[in-house]
From Swiss-Prot:
PROSITE patterns per the UniProt record, alphabetical: EF_TS_1, EF_TS_2
The name this protein goes by in its record: Elongation factor Ts
Keywords: Cytoplasm, Elongation factor, Protein biosynthesis
Main location group: cytoplasm
InterPro entries for the chain: EF-Ts_dimer_sf (IPR036402), Transl_elong_EFTs/EF1B (IPR001816), Transl_elong_EFTs/EF1B_dimer (IPR014039), Transl_elong_Ts_CS (IPR018101), UBA-like_sf (IPR009060)
Matches recorded under Pfam families: EF_TS (PF00889)
Taxonomic lineage from the root: Bacteria, Pseudomonadati, Pseudomonadota, Alphaproteobacteria, Hyphomicrobiales
Subcellular location: Cytoplasm
Family (UniProt): Belongs to the EF-Ts family.
Matches recorded under PANTHER family: ELONGATION FACTOR TS (PTHR11741), ELONGATION FACTOR TS, MITOCHONDRIAL (PTHR11741:SF0)
Length: 308
């Protein structure tokens, strides 16, 4: 059986908002598996967490750049926020975004692309040597449409086109480009705030949907619901889940009456003058999924003093 540490209990508690003793029991019941412990708590009705939250700890900048029917979003990491506020680093991020807009989202292609007398990889190496801190082009994504607009939004912008979060949204339409651009930016802001996981229910990972179905069913069985009612209750629960995680199903943040994103887009077709289709979206939050190495400050001081 796995040893349950205080750090594990703390992580589960921060992820789920559940009390310490319940978190400890959940970890004990699931042999220390955090994801399984979250499901165990949900089945007991103690947690609404859908999955383990990524521990965001990396520094750097998200860059986003669009040009009519195409757009890119990139993440460049640094070791400290101090460097992220450095003008040379900011210029590096903007340059990489410009290159990505030309060559696409493949990291090897971006790194090999020529810039001046060097390449992107060479420019990153030069910046590392000059600034004295490690930097990495972590990821990139691109969207394009044959006609329409790719719009972007940067949240907590440090400079124009770069900040702590970036979103691009692709709209396919033969309508007015200026109206599409306004709608696209509003949708990008919605994506930043609502963090949808998929465009619609059919775009969700079937394994994720099945996991939700099983968690809900087990929860209602433990509540003593009749088996012949559970399937219907679960289906209704999935509809609610879709409204939480699917972009087209979500309540549009720019509408106080609670219309869905799909309804808002449909209504916008009047201004645009043509049908509109959301082809895709990408949302990058700085450092998501990266865990920063933690240290015990007291232990470091003791070690430096020769204590044990």
């Amino acid at each position: 059986m796995a040893t349950i540490t205080a750090a594990m209990v703390k992580e589960l508690r921060e992820t789920t908002g559940v009390g310490m003793m319940d978190c400890k029991q959940a970890l004990a019941e699931t042999d220390g598996n955090i994801d399984a412990a979250i499901d165990w708590l949900r089945k007991k009705g103690l947690s609404k967490a859908a999955k383990k939250a990524g521990r965001v700890a990396a520094e750097g900048l998200i860059g986003a750049l669009t040009d009519g029917t195409k757009g890119v979003v990139i993440e460049v990491n640094s070791e400290t926020d101090f460097v992220a506020r450095n003008e040379q680093f900011q210029g590096l991020v903007k340059m990489i975004a410009q290159v990505a807009l030309k060559v696409g989202a493949d990291l090897d292609a971006i790194n090999a692309a020529p810039v001046g007398s060097t390449t992107v990889a060479g420019a990153i190496a030069d910046a590392i040597a000059t600034i004295g801190e490690n930097m990495t082009l972590r990821r990139a994504a691109a969207l394009s449409v044959s006609q329409g607009v790719v719009a972007s939004y940067i949240h907590n912008a440090v400079i124009d086109g770069a900040g702590k979060m970036g979103v691009i949204v692709a709209l396919e339409s033969a309508g007015k480009a200026d109206e599409l651009a306004v709608l696209g930016r509003q949708l990008a802001m919605h994506v930043a705030a609502a963090n949808p996981q998929a465009l619609d229910p059919t775009s969700l990972d079937p394994a994720v949907v099945q996991r939700e179905r099983e968690v809900m069913a087990d929860k209602y069985r433990q509540q003593g619901k009749p088996e012949n009612m559970i399937e219907k209750i679960v289906e209704n629960g999935l509809k609610t889940y879709y409204k939480e995680v699917c972009l087209l199903e979500q309540a549009y943040i720019h509408d106080e009456k609670g219309k869905s994103v799909a309804q808002a887009v449909k209504e916008a077709e009047g201004k645009v003058g043509a049908p509109i289709k959301i082809v895709g979206f990408v949302r990058y939050a700085l450092g998501e999924g990266i865990e920063k190495q933690t240290s015990d400050f007291a232990a470091e001081v003791a070690a430096a003093s020769g204590q044990k």
